[in-house]
Amino acid sequence: MGFFSFIQEIAMDLGTANTIIISDDKIVVDEPSVVALDRRTDKMIAVGEKAKMMYEKTHDNIRTIRPLRDGVIADFTACEQMMRGLIKMVHTGSRLFSPSLRMVIGLPSSSTEVELRAVRDSAEHADGRDVYLIFEPMAAAIGIGIDVEAPEGNMIVDIGGGSTEIAVISLGGIVSNNSIRTAGDDLTADIQEYMSRQHNVKVSERMAERIKIHVGSALTDLGDEAPEDFIVHGPNRITALPMEVPVCYQEIAHCLDKTVAKIENAVLSALENTPPELYADIVKNGIWLSGGGALLRGLDKRLQDKINIPFHIAEDPLHSVAKGAGIALKNVDRFSFLMR
């Protein structure tokens, strides 16, 4: 990227929980999808990790917002500000002019025309000149290294923060898909509710997320891979006195069971709608898991035991969509039929 470069290409996975930006084949931004705004002026105070540090800790003059809910934009203005702030992180080095942006953005395959328009408008207001949109399961498949143009069926299950995208891909198109608004945020909410009900301890969204990372599991028996208990500190829900509660992975597996079952059922539903020839390919190739939810301990084994088809976790599940979007952007002519 030179001194007089007028066009910069960036690929973005605009996620409910995290936003990832790739430029020049490198991950240049990997930040929480959070923005902090001044209530009086609506000016941005912080974005990404800095804004997340303020989350649930602000006074009346600052509001912290997660602009996306269930994989789609819930607050248009905040999303535009967040995108601007995150894109600014990409502009490093000295240039005479701010470059025009050529962008491709990954979105849920269930997005309505209105939701697609909202993302495109946000990107254009954040200085995007050419804005392409690609559905997340297709981007994830490209990022994993699947030949999406091949005449064979591959199934992708992309579990993000706000939505789970399940798609059967063949010949460069999505043959059948199932998108549910049950994903990582629901697992976090389950843990918050469980800690309050079972242990009488109030935990924040951030603490529930830490519990999920340290002892989250889809199975009650992880064998040798079992994590150590996690100590949770928080106020008693009734007395407000400080508490210290050890939490084990087995109890978290029980509390996440219903949400994981919804994901299982969504995968089964997508398989039911898959043509027999493609179904045979999927049984042979296995099903690919991507997104942050793919990192939940034991999820691949639980799904495999339930569905009797091998499940593979992508090599870099958190970045599969962004990497695939980056490859699509570098090969726009080849992949133009995948983009909107």
Where are these regions (language model features)?
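Nucleotide/phosphate-binding catalytic cleft detector across ATP-hydrolyzing
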Residues: M1-I159, A167-I287, A294-R340
